[in-house]
C-alpha cells in the first residue's frame, strides 16, 4: 500500500482530515512528568493512543526529539504507532534539503531507520536533492511550498523574472511538483493555513497533489477557511465530487498536545482533536 493509499484509507476509516503533530516540549509536560526528557515517549504514546481513531496522520517533528538526544524514543514511538494505529500513516517532519550521498543518508534515516511513510523536504536545492527519497517507491515527500511563517514572504512570494509567466516562487514550486518532478506520484506540498488565498492558488496549480497544511490551532489558522480554500469547491459541488480530489491533511500540534497541563492531558488532547476534526469535516460539506 502506498502512502497515498494509506492516507485515503485513514481518511475513510476515521472520517478525518486531521493530522496530530507530535512536537514534545518536556517543559510543558504535565506535572507528574516533571519536565523529564526520558518521558517523551510516554507523553507522545499517550497522545497517539488517545487520538488514533480521530486522525488521518501523525507527524512527529524530528528536532523535538533530536534536541533531547531522544531519537531512540522516536524510533520506539513510531514502532508503537504501527502496533496501536497501523492504519494511520506517519509523516516525519524533517524538512531535509541536501544533495548527493548526504541526501541518500537522510532518505535512509527517514524510511529505513524510522520507517516513516512520508517526509517533509526543502526543494531549494532542486530536483536532484529529491531523487534519493523518490527511489523509495510508495513513500511520500512533501515539499515546502508556501509556509505558515511570516518570513516565508522573503523568498516564497518573490517573482521569478527568468521563468515563463514570471510566477511567484511558491507558484513555481507547485507547478514543478504537479508536473515534471512528480515522476512516481509521490509528491505533496506544504502550504500554511495562515495564507488561505495562497492555499487556494496552490490547489489550482496542483489539483492532484496531497496538501499538508500546518497553522491551525496555536498558529491562528481558521479551520473553515482552510478547508474551503483547499477544496476549492464551487457552490453546489457534491460531496461525492469532493471525495475524488487529492487529500488535504490539516495539522494541529500544540493546541492538542497541551490542551491540559494536568494528569488528564491525554483525555483533553482527545477532546481537542475531536472538536478540530469535527470543525474540519463540517467545513467540508458543500454549501
UniProtKB/Swiss-Prot annotation:
Pathway: Pyrimidine metabolism; UMP biosynthesis via de novo pathway; UMP from orotate: step 2/2. Gene3D superfamilies: Aldolase class I. Its EC number is 4.1.1.23. It comes from the Bacteria. GO terms for molecular function: orotidine-5'-phosphate decarboxylase activity. Pfam families: OMPdecase (PF00215). GO terms for biological process: 'de novo' pyrimidine nucleobase biosynthetic process; 'de novo' UMP biosynthetic process. Keywords: Decarboxylase, Lyase, Pyrimidine biosynthesis. It catalyses: orotidine 5'-phosphate + H(+) = UMP + CO2. The active site is at residue 95. The keyword rRNA-binding does not apply. NCBIfam families: pyrF_sub2. Belongs to the OMP decarboxylase family. Type 2 subfamily. This is Orotidine 5'-phosphate decarboxylase. It comes from Albidiferax ferrireducens (strain ATCC BAA-621 / DSM 15236 / T118) (Rhodoferax ferrireducens). The lineage of its organism: Bacteria, Pseudomonadati, Pseudomonadota, Betaproteobacteria, Burkholderiales. The gene is pyrF.
